[in-house]
A protein has these predicted regions:
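Membrane-proximal basic amphipathic "stem/tether" segments
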Residues: 2, 230, 250-305
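A short acidic, Gly/Pro-enriched loop at the edge of an enzyme's catalytic core
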Residues: 128-140
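Class I SAM-dependent methyltransferase SAM/SAH-binding core
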Residues: 72-128
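A short SAM/SAH-binding and catalytic strip from SAM-dependent methyltransferases
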Residues: 138-151
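Class I SAM-dependent methyltransferase Rossmann-like catalytic core
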Residues: 2-64
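Short alpha-helix
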Residues: 189-217
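Conserved class I S-adenosyl-L-methionine
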Residues: 170-197
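A short glycine-rich, Lys/Arg-flanked "PGG" loop and its adjoining helix->strand segment in the class I
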Residues: 153-168
């Protein structure tokens, strides 16, 4: 319980930076337009390192269940990275895509504040994802987000529980990002590929995901040309009950909510988060206004200092 609460508290302390980043990215016209030119919103679904069509059902199979393939973009932030349709042969197949993030309330406020006509983000937490959607998704996408969670292994198990048997979980992450970012903000875990295995680790723990999934899922892991770690996991059987405990999850949430309520209303955490947001928002106001190439150069100089 204490470990879960510590993970939650560390994650909460990373919220101000994340909100300041998106608030100012959406503030400036050129950064917002740059985001849309990079994302596949309104375009064909594109997944780096694989053919997206190979992990989605045929139009006939999708129609037999829900009419459209269900795709969950978990930890989506405000990136709108995946596309909205795919080509089934020559036929355009629409996707029921849901952008899911625990900070949905804040992101939707930013959308409204910046007058952006984009789909609202749906609330959902990777570590408790099956409480929102269970056994019906065709594809779960987690990009640059699993290593930002407070319990990434639990996030993988929960993602698999949302899939029907035969569904896919697609992961795409920068290698060892917590090490790169010095464990600041949401960066508490590293993801890497070692001899075809997916490893999730930090200074306190290390897990072999291939070993964890043995018997109920297959996994293909590779490092693509730009260095990203891409893993494609196919659910082949139901997740063993020994790997999750819904009652324990409820206890964790109740306990964490109680502590959070106390800390916020005691004033300490509330003031700390407000001060952190004010600081990061000030910094991001200027950082996001800079040309992209200059931002990259400054980041490299800071790391070398």
């Amino acid at each position: 319980m204490d470990k879960a609460n510590n993970g939650m508290n560390n994650w909460i302390e990373g919220i101000p930076y994340e909100l300041a980043f998106w608030n100012n990215l959406y503030r400036w016209r050129w950064t917002y337009e740059g985001l849309l030119s990079w994302s596949n919103y309104g375009k064909e679904l594109c997944l780096e390192g694989i053919d997206a069509r190979s992990v989605l059902p045929s139009a006939t199979a999708a129609a037999a269940r829900s009419g459209k393939p269900i795709v969950l973009d978990v930890g989506a932030g405000m990136s709108y990275a995946p596309g909205n349709f795919y080509l089934n042969g020559t036929e355009r197949q629409e996707i029921d895509i849901r952008y899911i993030d625990p900070l949905a309330f804040h992101y939707n406020r930013i959308l409204k504040k910046r007058h952006k006509n984009l789909p609202e983000v749906t609330f959902g937490v990777a570590e408790y994802l099956s409480s929102c959607v269970a056994d019906e998704a065709d594809l779960v996408i987690i990009q640059n987000a699993l290593d930002h969670s407070f319990a990434p292994i639990k996030g993988i198990i929960e993602a698999l529980r949302t899939l029907h048997t035969g569904g896919f979980l697609y992961l795409n992450h920068h290698p060892n990002e917590a090490e790169t970012e010095d464990y600041k903000g949401f960066h508490k875990f590293n993801i890497c590929e070692e001899h075809g295995k997916l490893i999730i680790w930090n200074k306190e723990s290390r897990r072999d995901v291939n070993e964890l999934l043995n018997g109920f899922a297959t996994i293909d892991v590779k490092t693509v040309e730009n260095g990203h770690i891409v893993a494609l996991i196919k659910k082949t059987a139901e997740v063993p009950a020994s790997l999750y405990d819904d009652k324990a999850s409820i206890r964790e949430l109740c306990h964490s909510n109680h502590l959070l309520f106390y800390q916020v209303y005691s004033g300490h955490l509330s003031m700390k988060l407000k001060c952190s947001y004010a600081f990061y928002n000030f910094i991001q106001f200027f950082v996001q206004a800079l040309p992209h190439n200059l931002k990259i150069k400054l980041k490299k100089l800071i790391k070398q200092a």
